[in-house]
């Protein structure tokens, strides 16, 4: 079931902040999950990216393009 964090994610999906050292990890994971065409795995990764921002581990702002994944907000990290 959606949580309060999920609602905040939907509100803030256009500008997600993540920790700089994690950027290459997320880029690689997004690329791999996209190749598997598994939207559930991509959605989980999106939540991980958001939670990094929610806990204040922020060095860099990445712009995120929203798209629907299984009827819920998902995202593709751009510019990596």
From Swiss-Prot:
It catalyses: Hydrolysis of proteins to small peptides in the presence of ATP and magnesium. alpha-casein is the usual test substrate. In the absence of ATP, only oligopeptides shorter than five residues are hydrolyzed (such as succinyl-Leu-Tyr-|-NHMec, and Leu-Tyr-Leu-|-Tyr-Trp, in which cleavage of the -Tyr-|-Leu- and -Tyr-|-Trp bonds also occurs). Coiled coil: none annotated. The active site is at 19. Its EC number is 3.4.21.92. GO terms for cellular component: chloroplast. Keywords: Chloroplast, Hydrolase, Plastid, Protease, Serine protease. One of its GO terms (molecular function) is serine-type endopeptidase activity. On the 2D-gel the determined pI of this protein is: 5.7, its MW is: 22.8 kDa. Component of the chloroplastic Clp protease core complex. Cleaves peptides in various proteins in a process that requires ATP hydrolysis. Has a chymotrypsin-like activity. Plays a major role in the degradation of misfolded proteins. This is Putative ATP-dependent Clp protease proteolytic subunit. The lineage of its organism: Eukaryota, Viridiplantae, Streptophyta, Embryophyta, Tracheophyta. The gene is clpP.
């Amino acid at each position: 079931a959606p949580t309060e964090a999920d609602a905040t994610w939907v509100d803030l999906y256009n500008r997600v902040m993540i920790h700089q050292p994690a950027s290459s990890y997320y880029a690689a994971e997004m690329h791999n999950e996209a190749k598997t065409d598994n939207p559930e795995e991509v959605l989980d990764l999106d939540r991980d990216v958001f939670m990094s921002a929610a806990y204040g581990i922020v060095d860099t702002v990445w712009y995120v393009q929203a798209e629907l994944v299984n009827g819920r907000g998902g995202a593709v990290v751009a510019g990596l």
